[in-house]
Regions:
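Hydrophobic alpha-helical transmembrane segments
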Residues: 66-88, 107, 111
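Interfacial helix-loop-helix junctions of multi-pass membrane proteins
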Residues: 16-28, 108-139, 188
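Structural alpha/beta surface segment adjacent to cysteine/selenocysteine redox centers
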Residues: 6, 227, 233-317, 345
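Internal/C-terminal transmembrane anchor helices
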Residues: 157-185
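Local sequence-structure signature of Cys/Sec-based thiol-disulfide redox active-site neighborhoods
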Residues: 7, 120, 211-239
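Extracytosolic (periplasmic/ER-lumenal) interhelical loops and adjacent juxtamembrane/interface segments
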Residues: 18-67
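Cytosolic-side transmembrane helix boundary signature
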Residues: 137-168
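C-terminal cap of thioredoxin/glutaredoxin-like
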Residues: 224-225, 236-243, 310-385
Length: 385
């Protein structure tokens, strides 16, 4: 009963966070081990999980998709009700009902193990709300198995096979009901997808943008990215995971949010981003490889950037060699990065990353995270598998 109630609480928090973003705005998240804790803006791991391809189903049909927390919500509601029934019935509960509860009571734990594996291997972080669901699943499974363990002679009636035969489809139905209700109420986002403007000045050779052409490009795109921007990293990784990058012919304008080189900032949001951006430029044909290395090592590079230039430069030299550092220090590289920043200014780019254009059309910020796959399916179906 305790595990079901906790699971219901954590699944509700996760679902409410997801549904709140249907208004296309950014909201704080309930990211805490404490059930019912207030939302907070310090929830990077939970936001990473929410924006990941694993957080929802049918993302290409519904903006944001159908969050998997809805299925957990329905399942935990069923288990809470069944646990209450067993608690009230006591020794009068049929053995087959107890056995059924023990059998299906481990299923949330099995799903939690799969999701925990994805968090560890694909996301690299654990959402506290998700961990709360994992713990709840463990408590539910433990209680269900202990309740079915023999404790000597029992006076419980055997019960009919109709008990599991009836309750198994009931579990499936109750698990699906929240998702069905959610799907029926998701607003149509198509009218909003084209309201964020278009490119003012197309890239020219003199802008010296970098090229990241996929293996099967079918659509031109323009990205403004900062290699030390966590949102850029998540966006890039989502595109790569869904195979979209391989279908795009991307021109990359580096837009470091670092006042060392970016005159649009009075202070650095991402210290060291200018140096790392120059390293990406110095990668030339390997620019995408250097950018993805920066994303993979973003935490270490960000810490080094805050410690100072020598620490950051040492990390770059260790991976890419002394020649790259010489290139980073060259006046030519500085001028190229300056051209990228001027190109951003000419297009009225906000001091925020990533900024994304498909062809000439700007993709709204909110459509680059939760609504990304839906947006691509509507605006550029040829790039979605």
């Amino acid at each position: 009963m305790v595990g079901s109630a906790l699971g219901l609480t954590f699944a509700s928090s996760s679902t409410l966070d997801y549904a709140a973003h249907l208004d296309r705005r950014l909201h704080d998240l309930h990211c805490s081990f404490v059930p019912g804790a207030p939302p907070t803006d310090a929830a990077e791991a939970c936001r990473t999980a929410m924006y990941s391809p694993y957080a929802a189903l049918f993302r290409d049909k519904y903006w944001g998709g159908i969050p998997i927390s809805l299925f957990a919500l329905g399942a935990f509601a069923f288990f809470a009700g069944f646990a209450l029934y067993l608690l009230i019935a006591g020794e009068r509960a049929p053995r087959r009902a107890v056995g059924f509860f023990a059998l299906v009571g481990v299923t949330p734990l099995l799903v939690s193990l799969v999701m925990a594996g994805i968090s560890a291997t694909q996301l690299g972080s654990f959402c506290k709300t998700c961990v709360g669901i994992y713990i709840s699943s463990f408590l539910l499974a433990l209680g269900a198995l202990l309740g079915a363990a023999p404790k000597g002679p029992s006076e419980r009636p055997l019960g009919s096979w109709l008990v599991p035969a009836a309750f198994l489809p009931a579990l499936g139905a109750v698990s699906l009901v929240p998702a069905a209700v959610y799907a029926s109420s998701v607003p149509d986002h198509r009218p909003y997808l084209g309201l964020c403007g278009s490119l003012k000045k197309e890239p020219a050779a003199g802008d010296a943008l970098l090229r990241m052409t996929g293996q099967r490009p079918v659509k031109p795109a323009l990205f403004f990215e900062d290699p030390l921007c966590p949102t850029c990293r998540a966006f890039h990784q989502r595109l790569a995971a869904e195979g979209v990058l391989e279908r795009l012919d991307v021109q990359l304008a580096l837009f470091p949010l670092d006042s060392e080189c970016n005159w649009m900032l009075s202070s650095a949001m991402h210290p060291g981003a200018c140096t790392v951006s120059k390293a990406v430029i110095c990668g030339k044909d390997r620019g995408r490889q250097v950018l993805e290395w920066a994303y993979d090592e973003q935490e270490a590079l960000s810490r080094a950037g805050k410690l100072g230039a020598p620490t950051l430069r040492a990390l770059i030299e260790k991976r890419w060699g002394a020649d790259t550092l010489q290139c980073v220090d060259s006046n030519d590289t500085k001028q190229i990065l300056n051209k990228h920043l001027h190109f951003a200014t000419e297009n009225g780019i906000a001091v925020s990353t990533p900024q994304v254009f498909l062809g000439k059309q700007r993709i709204c910020d909110e459509d680059t995270d939760m609504g990304l796959r839906y947006t691509l399916r509507v605006l550029a179906p040829e790039v979605v598998r």
